């Protein structure tokens, strides 16, 4: 309920202020495990992807974002923390659990925002989680 409310609010704001145009939603399967793998340019990328997707989306987010109050809001909206700089087994397991339950996990495979707009080297986590959960991977571009 809260997720849908926040998603619809962002959809209105993005449509009015950013003139958000979404293409390719027909490529998002209606059910089953799904990884949305996207480039990452801005702090607005997670709400843009969540708004554009036709299903509820869970996000891995750097653990530094999970400060009091804000971290609780992120968790209510389906995000979970990941420790960057190495293999965070708990976060990887949580991502696989989300996928194995037939849900959607959005990942920014580069692990950080691009400062130049160029694609960086992808980390192996997205492919590994999708493979273990037998999830479909849908690429996204913002």
PLM regions and their residue ranges:
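Helix-enriched interaction subdomains in cytosolic or periplasmic regions
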Residues: 1-6
């Amino acid at each position: 309920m809260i997720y849908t409310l926040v998603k619809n609010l962002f959809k209105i704001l993005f449509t009015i202020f950013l003139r958000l145009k979404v293409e390719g939603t027909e490529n998002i399967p209606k059910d089953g495990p799904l990884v949305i793998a996207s480039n990452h340019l801005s702090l607005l990328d997670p709400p843009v992807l969540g708004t554009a997707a036709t299903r509820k989306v869970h996000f891995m987010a750097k653990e530094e974002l999970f400060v009091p109050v804000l971290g609780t809001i992120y968790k209510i909206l389906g995000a979970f923390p990941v420790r960057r700089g190495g293999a965070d087994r708990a976060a990887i397991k949580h991502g696989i659990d989300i996928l194995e339950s037939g849900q959607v996990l959005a990942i920014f495979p580069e692990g950080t925002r691009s400062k130049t707009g160029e694609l960086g080297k992808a980390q192996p986590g997205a492919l590994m989680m999708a493979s273990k959960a037998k999830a479909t991977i849908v690429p996204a571009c913002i």
